[in-house]
C-alpha cells in the first residue's frame, strides 16, 4: 500500500526509491504523486523566492580605494526538470537558510571580484551597469546549482576615507558651476526673451491702439457724416416747413388783400353812393345859404383828405413790407382814389361857381384871421378924418385890394366869381 501526496506550486515533491532497487526519481510541483510505504521516499524543496543581501566591506577597487558595497538579490530554484534535479541533488534536505547562505557566498565572491576591476566612478555613477555585470558573471555559477537570479541591484556604495564625498563635492562644485552658468545663461536668455516679448507686446499694443484710433476716427467721421446728413435733412425739413408756412401766410395775406380790396371796393361804392346822395342833397338844397354848404363840403373834404393820407401811409407801409403781394392793393386803391377824385371833380364841376364860392367862403375866415392877427394886440383903433366920405373910400379901397390878396395867398381869382365881381364892381 502507499499514500497519495500533493504539493502546491511553491514547492517541489521528490519521490525516490521503489521496489526491485529502482533508482527512478519523480519531481512534482503543483500536483500529486503516489508513494509506496516503506520502499519510497518523499522529500520537499521550496520553490519560493529567496531575498539575499550581499555585502562586501572594504573591497579595493581598480584604483585601490576601499569601498563597502551592499546589494539586494532575488533568487529561486528553477522548475525545469533537469535544473530542478540538479538543485535537488545539491540542496535537497537543506533548509532555506542553508541554500541562501550558499548562494549569498557565491554572489559576494563575484561581487568582490568585479569591484576589483572597476573604478570608483564607474561603480558609483553607473550602478545599473555594475549590477548587470555582477548578474551576468554570477548567473552561470548559480545556474549550475539550479538557482536562477531574478534580479540584482546595488543598494548602497560608501567608503570610510571620504573619497565619495570628495568626489561628490567636486562634482557638486562642477554641477553648481554649470548650474550658475546655466542660471546666468537662462537669465540672459530670459531677459532677451522678456525684452523681445515686451517689444512684441508693445508692437501689438501700438498696433491695437492704432487700429482703435483708426476705428474711433472712422466712427467719428461716420458719426459726423450721419450728423451732417441728419442736420441737412432737418434743415431741409425746417426750410420746407418755413417755405410752406410762408406760402400759407402768403395765401392768407393774399386772401386778406383780396378781402381788403373787396372792402375797399364796397367802401368806394358806398362813397360813390354817398357822393350821389350828396349830389342829390345839393340839388335839393341849392337854395340854402352858400356859406353853410361850402363850409360843410370843405370839412368833409379836409376829413376825407386826412383820412386818405393816413390810409395811404398805412397802406404804403404794408405794401413795402409784403412786397409784390400789396401791389394789387395799391393798384386797386389808386383806382378807387382816382374814381373818388373823379367823382368829386365831376361834382365840383357840376356845381360850378357855387362849389368854388363855398371853398372861397371857407378860406376867407382863415385869411381874415391871418390878416387881423397883428390887430389882436391893439386895444382900440381911432380913425382920424374929418370927412365921412374918406372913410368910405378907404373901406372901398380895402375891398378892392382883397381879391388880389386872396389870389396871392390861395391862387383863387375872386374877380372871376360873379358874386364877388358884382360886390367889388358896385364898390368901384
From Swiss-Prot:
A lipid is attached at residues 4, 19-20 (S-palmitoyl cysteine). Gene3D superfamilies: Band 7 domain. GO terms for biological process: cell adhesion; protein localization to plasma membrane; regulation of myoblast differentiation. Signal peptide: none annotated. InterPro entries: Band_7, Band_7/SPFH_dom_sf, Flotillin_C, Flotillin_fam. The modification Phosphoserine is found at residue 405. This is Flotillin-2. The gene is FLOT2.
Amino acid at each position: 500500500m502507499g499514500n497519495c501526496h500533493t504539493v502546491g506550486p511553491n514547492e517541489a515533491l521528490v519521490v525516490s526509491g521503489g521496489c526491485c532497487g529502482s533508482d527512478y526519481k519523480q519531481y512534482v510541483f503543483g500536483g500529486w504523486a503516489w508513494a509506496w510505504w516503506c520502499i519510497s521516499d518523499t522529500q520537499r524543496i521550496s520553490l519560493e523566492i529567496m531575498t539575499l543581501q550581499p555585502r562586501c566591506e572594504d573591497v579595493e577597487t581598480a584604483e585601490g580605494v576601499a569601498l563597502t558595497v551592499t546589494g539586494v538579490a532575488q533568487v529561486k530554484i528553477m522548475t525545469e526538470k533537469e535544473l530542478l534535479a540538479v538543485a535537488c541533488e545539491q540542496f535537497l534536505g537543506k533548509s532555506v537558510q542553508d541554500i541562501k547562505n550558499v548562494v549569498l557566498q557565491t554572489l559576494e565572491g563575484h561581487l568582490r571580484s568585479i569591484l576589483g576591476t572597476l573604478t570608483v566612478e564607474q561603480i558609483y555613477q553607473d550602478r545599473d551597469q555594475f549590477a548587470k555585470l555582477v548578474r551576468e558573471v554570477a548567473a552561470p555559477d548559480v545556474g549550475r546549482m539550479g538557482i536562477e537570479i531574478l534580479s540584482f541591484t546595488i543598494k548602497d556604495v560608501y567608503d570610510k576615507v571620504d573619497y565619495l564625498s570628495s568626489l561628490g563635492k567636486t562634482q557638486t562644485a562642477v554641477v553648481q558651476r554649470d548650474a550658475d552658468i546655466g542660471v546666468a545663461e537662462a537669465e540672459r536668455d530670459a531677459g532677451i526673451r522678456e525684452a523681445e516679448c515686451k517689444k512684441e507686446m508693445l508692437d501689438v499694443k501700438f498696433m491695437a491702439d492704432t487700429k482703435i484710433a483708426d476705428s474711433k476716427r472712422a466712427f467719428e467721421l461716420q458719426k459726423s457724416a450721419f450728423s451732417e446728413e441728419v442736420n441737412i435733412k432737418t434743415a431741409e425739413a425746417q426750410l420746407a416747413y418755413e417755405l410752406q408756412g410762408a406760402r400759407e401766410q402768403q395765401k392768407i395775406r393774399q386772401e386778406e388783400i383780396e378781402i381788403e380790396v373787396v372792402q375797399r371796393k364796397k367802401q368806394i361804392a358806398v362813397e360813390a353812393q354817398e357822393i350821389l346822395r350828396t349830389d342829390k342833397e345839393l340839388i335839393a338844397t341849392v337854395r340854402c345859404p352858400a356859406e353853410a354848404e361850402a363850409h360843410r363840403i370843405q370839412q368833409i373834404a379836409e376829413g376825407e383828405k386826412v383820412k386818405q393820407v393816413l390810409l395811404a401811409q398805412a397802406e404804403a407801409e404794408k405794401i413795402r413790407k409784403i412786397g409784390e403781394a400789396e401791389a394789387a392793393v395799391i393798384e386797386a386803391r389808386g383806382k378807387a382814389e382816382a374814381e373818388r377824385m373823379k367823382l368829386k371833380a365831376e361834382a365840383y364841376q357840376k356845381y360850378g361857381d357855387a362849389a368854388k364860392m363855398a371853398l372861397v367862403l371857407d378860406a376867407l375866415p382863415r385869411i381874415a384871421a391871418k390878416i387881423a392877427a397883428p390887430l389882436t394886440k391893439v386895444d382900440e383903433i381911432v380913425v382920424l378924418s374929418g370927412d365921412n366920405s374918406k372913410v368910405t373910400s378907404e373901406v372901398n379901397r380895402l375891398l378892392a385890394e382883397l381879391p388880389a390878396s386872396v389870389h396871392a395867398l390861395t391862387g383863387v381869382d375872386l374877380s372871376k366869381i360873379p358874386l364877388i365881381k358884382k360886390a367889388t364892381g358896385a364898390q368901384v
